[in-house]
């Protein structure tokens, strides 16, 4: 599995601010959007270009570069992933949205999809999953599996922070996906929280506890 930890100073600086215990909902939400925007820029750097002809401002046909082939659908994992969508839209405003919601089954401890609203022609699109945290990897693996079952063949993932344990688990289950993250953190604690992590990103984005 391709894993890219973004080392850009602006990404690291903004992520550092997000780790503060005193951060406000407004600030956390703003930084989530800004970092997601920077990560989306990195993800799309590998997209191919092709030449196309348009009518230029001077009234003559001119040749321009345009992104080739597949269009994009952004896939937020509910609910925290919703806070990352605007960062993607800054670069790909026409992206369609496919939403996935997961809950953990108390008996099996496995993630179960309680909601899935996917766009059409997934096999012709790049699916960009967004979720602030990759902890154990369970929800992410289930989301990737759901997308593949629906026809998706090109899947990329953006997270703000990722645990090594979650990366390893995801790589074993889906070695063909790509992960772009602002930070590979130290480890998971005994409660499966990422350390040093960000705390509960969903609560901090939506101002709940």
From Swiss-Prot:
GO terms for molecular function: GTP binding; magnesium ion binding; uracil phosphoribosyltransferase activity. Allosterically activated by GTP. Its cofactor is Mg(2+). Its EC number is 2.4.2.9. It catalyses: UMP + diphosphate = 5-phospho-alpha-D-ribose 1-diphosphate + uracil. Uracil binds at residues 194, 199-201. Pathway: Pyrimidine metabolism; UMP biosynthesis via salvage pathway; UMP from uracil: step 1/1. One of its GO terms (biological process) is uracil salvage. PANTHER family: ADENINE PHOSPHORIBOSYLTRANSFERASE (PTHR32315), URACIL PHOSPHORIBOSYLTRANSFERASE, CHLOROPLASTIC (PTHR32315:SF4). This is Uracil phosphoribosyltransferase.
